[in-house]
């Protein structure tokens, strides 16, 4: 029994030693592959921030431009001059002229929702701004800086009347619902009360015609 037990222990020890060496060999065989995979991941992470920005690239051409495949290739925007981006030219990535970013819409006046009946609401779009047109409603002895017809002065800085600083703003297009009121005010200025020329207002009795 003693000899039999020693043989069994030797056999178990041999099997354990064999399994240990086999596992070590397997790990050593897998180690280069793992290191290579880690190296590729680090390379991708390092170059990820230098990838071309597609939002600044022109759309790819439908037909291949001449010399597109012979152009100097790039892999990142940092390889291109200041006003160029690494973009696809139909054949390869090359330094192309950057596309300007889309314009930003400035909401000068917050639109007010209009009730359409029931649960329906209509939200107006932004007011149209007259390009580079400033205005003021302060009357300091001279004519105020008014807006053209169909526009109203949206005050951006109130100014200070005590110090003689007039307010100023930008001309924005008047809302549709205010057009009738503006027209009546304009006609009232042109034909004040007591003048023979007047116009009829809705619901204000009979209409008086111009002579």
From Swiss-Prot:
Cell location: Secreted
Basic and acidic residues biased stretches: 182-198
GO molecular function: serine-type endopeptidase inhibitor activity
Domain WAP: 50-99
One GO cellular component term: extracellular region
Intrachain disulfide bonds: 57-87, 69-91, 74-86, 80-95
Heme as UniProt keyword: no
Keyword set includes Nucleus: no
Protein name: WAP four-disulfide core domain protein 1
Leader peptide range in chain numbering: 1-23
InterPro entries given in the database record: Elafin-like_sf, WAP_dom, WFDC1
Region described as Disordered: spans on this chain: 182-211
Purpose of the protein: Has growth inhibitory activity.
Sorted UniProt keywords: Disulfide bond, Protease inhibitor, Secreted, Serine protease inhibitor, Signal
GO biological process: negative regulation of inflammatory response; negative regulation of wound healing
């Amino acid at each position: 029994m003693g000899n039999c037990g020693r043989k069994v222990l030797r056999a178990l020890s041999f099997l354990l030693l064999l399994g240990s060496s086999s596992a070590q060999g397997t790990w050593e065989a897998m180690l280069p592959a793992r290191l290579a995979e880690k190296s590729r991941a680090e390379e991708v992470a390092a170059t990820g921030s230098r990838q071309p920005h597609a939002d600044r690239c022109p759309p790819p051409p439908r037909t291949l431009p001449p010399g597109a495949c012979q152009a100097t290739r790039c892999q990142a925007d940092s390889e291109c001059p200041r006003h160029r981006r690494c973009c696809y030219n139909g054949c390869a990535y090359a330094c192309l002229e950057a596309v300007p970013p889309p314009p930003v819409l400035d909401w000068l006046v917050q639109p007010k929702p209009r009730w359409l009946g029931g649960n329906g609401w209509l939200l107006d779009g932004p007011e149209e701004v007259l390009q580079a047109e400033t205005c003021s409603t302060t009357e300091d002895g001279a004519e105020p800086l008014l807006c053209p017809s169909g526009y109203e002065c949206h005050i951006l800085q109130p100014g200070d009347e005590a110090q003689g600083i007039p307010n100023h703003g930008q001309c924005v297009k008047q809302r549709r619902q205010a057009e009738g009121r503006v027209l009546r005010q304009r006609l009232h200025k042109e034909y004040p009360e007591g003048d023979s020329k007047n116009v009829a207002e809705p619901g204000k009795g009979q209409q008086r015609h111009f002579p």
